[in-house]
Design a protein with these regions (language model features):
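Conserved lysine of the Walker
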Residues: 15
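Conserved substrate/cofactor phosphate-moiety recognition/catalytic segment
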Residues: 19-69
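Pre-Walker A (Motif I) flank of P-loop NTPase domains
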Residues: 1-4, 67-69
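Walker A (P-loop) phosphate-binding loop of P-loop NTPases
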Residues: 12
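The Walker A (P-loop) glycine that initiates the GxxxxGKT/S ATP-binding motif of P-loop NTPases
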Residues: 6-9, 75
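A glycine- and Lys/Arg-enriched "phosphate-lid" helix/loop adjacent to the NTP-binding pocket
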Residues: 94-140
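NTP-dependent small-molecule kinase module
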Residues: 142-190
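Glycine-rich phosphate-binding loop used to anchor ATP phosphates in small-molecule kinases
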Residues: 49-103, 136, 140, 152
Length: 190
């Protein structure tokens, strides 16, 4: 059974860093990431390559699905548009594994993106980071975690990520950090 891994979370949460550490340990060799693709297309002006990188990412996703190959991708989960693709993958026999990297608030996400920009990384406007933070968390609970065969939540607010909870469509939810889990659910209801 092929696997589709999605690592989601707000901008600045450390999704790419986490993915590059975790996916090799899971045996995942194909990580489709629009930001990395854009850096390869135009390393001196990543923002100008973002649209083309997004199109290339979609082509790669479809190609992996057509081959029945394992793959992973990164997203903020701020859009609902990925859900039909996930369902198509599941209909084709894929197992959907979701990893959500959480930050305690949108202010921290904005701060992390600003730090990334100072270090030479790509920028995302503050209002976009804030909007994606709220929508991504809402969509995690309402759309993507209910679809996931298994999901894991990591809190990357501190210096290193810690496990918060895990579960899945046919799995009981196991909460390791109750206060953090409740904070996530409360933030989703704001």
């Amino acid at each position: 059974m092929p696997d589709l891994y999605i690592i989601g979370g707000p901008n600045g949460a450390g999704k790419t860093t986490t993915a590059l550490r975790v996916f090799p340990r899971l045996g995942v060799s194909s990580f489709i990431n629009a930001d990395i693709i854009a850096q390869g297309m135009s390393p001196l002006d990543v923002e100008s390559a973002a649209r083309a990188a997004g199109r290339f990412m979609l082509q790669e996703m479809e190609a992996h699905l057509a081959r029945g190959a394992d793959f992973a991708l990164e997203t903020t989960l701020a859009s609902r548009t990925l859900a039909p693709f996930v369902r198509r993958c599941q209909s084709a026999g894929y197992r959907f594994i979701l990893i959500y990297v959480w930050l305690e608030d949108a202010d921290l996400a904005v701060s992390r993106v600003a730090r990334r920009v100072r270090a030479g990384g790509h920028n995302i406007p503050d209002e976009v980071v804030r909007r994606r933070y709220e929508r991504g968390l809402k969509n995690f609970f309402e759309i993507y975690s209910p679809l996931a065969d298994s999901w894991t939540v990591l809190d990357n607010t501190g210096k290193s990520a810690v496990f918060v909870a895990q579960g899945g469509r046919e799995l009981a939810t196991d909460v390791m950090l109750l206060e953090t889990w409740q904070a996530m659910q409360g933030a989703d209801n704001d």
